[in-house]
UniProtKB/Swiss-Prot annotation:
It is a multi-pass membrane protein. Heme b b562 binds at H82, H183. One of its GO terms (cellular component) is mitochondrial inner membrane. It comes from the Eukaryota. This is Cytochrome b. PROSITE patterns: CYTB_CTER, CYTB_NTER. The gene is cob. Pfam families: Cytochrom_B_C (PF00032), Cytochrome_B (PF00033). PANTHER family: CYTOCHROME B. Its cofactor is heme b. The chain crosses the membrane at residues 32-52, 76-98, 113-133, 179-199, 226-246, 290-310, 322-342, 349-369. It comes from Aspergillus tubingensis.
Length: 385
């Protein structure tokens, strides 16, 4: 044990993974960190393996993916692991953010951890979009065309930026090459950000807990207690992931992407992957192109303002009935946006999307501050002598 505490590298591992004192009362909702680290590890290993057989060329990209599926030993397994773990990654990140919002993990002194987490979400979305373009099916081509064209909404220089991203006048070889290079690079940036996220949490006050109070009264070392606890959810995760990979690998994908990209034929509906749908719905609900793009990016960055707009004296919503109702309405609204993002742009989905978009932003900028002030007043009234 002595080398663990004296070796310059091992003592860092020891302080984070072995001796790290965790609050004794943290629930399974605090297990997402290990699951997300596992997802990132799977994505990097399977991604590097796929890159060994992939060709980033307009003529060969689709065929190289088919070659991986048919000719490479267990290539189908590597590809389906990569695709389905991406979905699992986002599902767990959304749960992780939901837990953070519920238990007030964004409040001081964890504000930096929360800000880095929001940057991680943005980088994840960029990485996922770049990866979705690479198989070069119909949805890849048209998704890339639509999303990169958003840059043309920027006044004066927009069209130049789009052509700079494409490396030409449409999605072509240069586009696929640069998307492949960036898609390969960004997971390593993600790993660095995840490390920063961990350091920011570890070097302030450590993990929060379901009571929202200081955890210093009762703590346990990370090993073996929380390692075993993490293993429980890791095994459950592998079981669920295996069900998707082996029995329904394309359940979360789009059948249109099994059709080779054809610039002369537009698919019936251009829809991104399910985990980007809520933000796509916000983009589409605003008729003005520039305002739609601003709203879509603001929807992600709105998470950053939570430490400022939540004026409550209590951490988390577990003991605040009004905030709890507001939180569950927000979650339901997010799921509604996810559904609307997959629908055609027609009545009543346009109107529903606009209502949901207003409600989404109102939650961060109006509902949270107003409700927290009301609850502060009620607490003061109740505790006044």
């Amino acid at each position: 044990m002595r080398i663990l505490k004296s070796h310059p590298l091992l003592k860092i591992v020891n302080s984070y993974m072995i001796d790290s004192p965790q609050p004794a009362n943290i629930s399974y909702l605090w297990n997402f960190g290990s699951l997300l680290a596992l997802c990132l590890g799977i994505q990097i290993v399977t991604g590097v393996t796929l890159a060994m057989h992939y060709t980033p060329s307009v003529l060969e990209a689709f065929n190289s993916v088919e070659h991986i599926m048919r000719d490479v030993n267990n290539g189908w397994l590597v590809r389906y692991l990569h695709a389905n773990t991406a979905s699992a990654f986002f599902f767990l990140v959304y749960l992780h953010i939901g837990r953070g919002l519920y238990y007030g993990s964004y409040k001081s002194p964890r504000t930096l951890t929360w800000a880095i987490g929001t940057v991680i979400l943005i980088v994840m979305m960029a990485t996922a979009f770049l990866g979705y373009v690479l198989p070069y099916g119909q949805m890849s081509l048209w998704g890339a065309t639509v999303i990169t064209n958003l840059m043309s909404a920027i006044p004066w220089i927009g069209q130049d930026i789009v052509e700079f991203i494409w490396g030409g006048f449409s999605v072509n070889n240069a586009t696929l090459n640069r998307f492949f290079a960036l898609h390969f690079l960004l997971p390593f940036v993600l790993a660095a950000l995840a490390l920063m996220h961990l350091i920011a949490m570890h070097d302030t006050v450590g993990s929060g807990n379901p009571l929202g109070i200081s955890g210093n009264y009762d703590r346990l070392p990370f090993a073996p207690y929380f390692i075993f606890k993490d293993l429980v959810t890791i095994f459950i995760f592998f079981i669920v992931l295996s069900i998707f990979v082996f029995f329904m690998p394309n359940a979360l994908g789009d059948s249109e992407n099994y059709v080779m990209a054809n610039p002369m034929q537009t698919p019936p509906a251009i829809v991104p992957e399910w985990y980007l749908l809520p933000f796509y719905a916000i983009l589409r609900s605003i008729p003005n192109k520039l305002l739609g793009v601003i709203a879509m990016f603001s929807a992600i960055l709105a998470l950053m303002v939570m430490p400022i707009t939540d004026l409550s004296k209590l951490r988390g919503v577990q003991f605040r009935p009004l905030s709890k109702v507001a939180f569950y309405i927000f979650v339901a609204n997010f799921l509604v946006l996810m559904q609307i993002g997959a629908k055609h742009v027609e009545t009543p989905f346009i109107e529903l999307g606009q209502i949901s978009t207003v409600l989404y932003f109102a939650h961060f900028f109006v509902i949270v501050p107003v409700v927290s002030l009301i609850e502060n007043s009620l607490v003061e009234l109740a505790t006044k002598k």
